Every structure is written in structure tokens, then in C-alpha cells.
């Protein structure tokens, strides 16, 4: 199977037109006519990721975050983006990113988070349609049984493997309905609060968004990387279901640049 056929399978699931206007999802580096030798699946592309792909015999890297966000005027290796590109090109490695198109796709990033949390009746917060394809930013789901706020925080720590959750004052009412936005979700908080949803889970939140939300909605911020860590599982499921015989590996390299001490 050619690399371009694997890309086509991934982009059937998360079509590029679903990405936000500011995004740069899609093919980042390389030529796609070669036979695919393997795919390395990751959240971010770093030099260590390119090295891992080469070590595992993969000539395709599928990332969530695009390697290239800003316009390039030269290719000299002066920053990590350029070094990753040069290293990948030298080794014949193609880089593909599925970013906000995967966030906005049905069954995408936010659906996977909801699945990990055990939510049911999962749906887009505000569904849209493009060429017969339903999509949207953020999802809403519910627990089969309501949780006390402190138990909700414990659940998040367990599911996402975090030692702490950034939150506002704990709700005194049970939590049943939950809105989710992987990555940075400040832009959806008002929609969730106005809809009467009990809790909002995201990876990042602007400081001033916390004010005035006491006992209105439970804000729970788990970290950008942590909120999207399961995205590679979606990539793997698509490839295994649509690209028979293609080897794929979830990267061993942790690319989270944020550390806590």
C-alpha cells in the first residue's frame, strides 16, 4: 500500500475541510508515492520522534499537532521545525498532521476522551454539516450515575494519569452532564455554561474564564497534552481497520514539553 492511500484513509475519517481557518493540518513533509513501510503515531513531531520513526522502520509519521504552523522563508536548520523537516526528508519520511479536522470529526478527539471517561449519549455541543458530513467543536455526554464533584476529580486523575486537576470551586450538586474540548477550550465555556451542563473538561483555560462560574459549572483543566494523549489510538484504529497489513506504532517518545516539579 502506498503512503498516499494511508493518508486518504485517515482523511476520509477527518476530512481536511473540517479544520479551522487558522490551522495547517494535512501533509507537512515528503512525497507520498512510496510504499508505506510503517506508521509512527504521535501527538507532536520532534527530532526524537523522527529518530524513533527511523529506528522502527517507519516512513510515515502521523501527528495530531502540525509541525509547520508559521510560514517558512528558509530551510537552514535554525529551529526544531526546520531540523525535523530536514531530518525527515533526508530519510524519506513523510509527515502528516490531523489537527482540528480530527478535533471536529465525529468519533474524533473529543469522542475518544468521552469514551475514556465512560460517558454515554455523546453528541456534538453544536453540530454542523458540510457536504453531508456532521462535525462540530466539543462534545457533550453524561454519566449513567451522577458523581459528586470530588469523585469526578478523582476519575479525571485516574483516566488521564495526572496528579492534579486545575479547577474552580467544587460544585455542591452532583455532576451528570459533561462538556469536553481537548486542547484549549476557553472558547466553548460560555456555550457549556449557558446550556446548563454540569462540568467542562479541557486541556487549557484562560485565567479570567474562571471568574463568576462558582456553582454554575465545574471547570476541570487536565493539561493540553494529557487531554489529547489518546488521539494516537484513533489513528491506529483507522489504519488497522482501513489499511490491511500496514504496521503502525504509537510512539514511545513523550513529547509533552511541560514539566511539573
Describe each region flagged by the PLM.
Residues 1-261:
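Hydrophobic structural segments
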